[in-house]
């Protein structure tokens, strides 16, 4: 399991997890802002 000179898996997982959290946060923020402006 000694890979070549590829990117470490934990870096990929960290970046993917952070990106997913940002997308989910922006989605909820947009929904909350839309709800607040519509009321």
Swiss-Prot record:
Subcellular localization, as worded in the UniProt entry: Cellular thylakoid membrane
Any GO BP annotation: photosynthesis
Membrane topology classification: Single-pass membrane protein
Swiss-Prot/TrEMBL keywords: Membrane, Photosynthesis, Photosystem II, Reaction center, Thylakoid, Transmembrane, Transmembrane helix
UniProt cross-references to Pfam families, sorted A to Z: PsbJ
Transmembrane segments: 7-27
Keyword Disulfide bond on entry: no
Organism domain of life: Bacteria
Annotated Gene Ontology cellular component terms: photosystem II reaction center; plasma membrane-derived thylakoid membrane
Cross-referenced InterPro entries: PSII_PsbJ (IPR002682), PSII_PsbJ_sf (IPR037267)
Main localization of the protein described in the UniProt heading: membrane
Oligomer status and interactors: PSII is composed of 1 copy each of membrane proteins PsbA, PsbB, PsbC, PsbD, PsbE, PsbF, PsbH, PsbI, PsbJ, PsbK, PsbL, PsbM, PsbT, PsbX, PsbY, PsbZ, Psb30/Ycf12, peripheral proteins PsbO, CyanoQ (PsbQ), PsbU, PsbV and a large number of cofactors. It forms dimeric complexes.
Task of the protein: One of the components of the core complex of photosystem II (PSII). PSII is a light-driven water:plastoquinone oxidoreductase that uses light energy to abstract electrons from H(2)O, generating O(2) and a proton gradient subsequently used for ATP formation. It consists of a core antenna complex that captures photons, and an electron transfer chain that converts photonic excitation into a charge separation.
Similarity comment: Belongs to the PsbJ family.
Name of the protein described by the UniProt record: Photosystem II reaction center protein J
Source organism of this protein record: Synechococcus sp. (strain ATCC 27144 / PCC 6301 / SAUG 1402/1) (Anacystis nidulans)
Gene from which this protein is expressed: psbJ
């Amino acid at each position: 399991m000694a890979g070549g000179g590829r990117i470490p898996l934990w870096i990929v997982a960290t970046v993917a997890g952070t990106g997913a959290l940002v997308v989910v946060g922006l989605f909820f923020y947009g929904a909350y802002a839309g709800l607040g402006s519509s009321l």
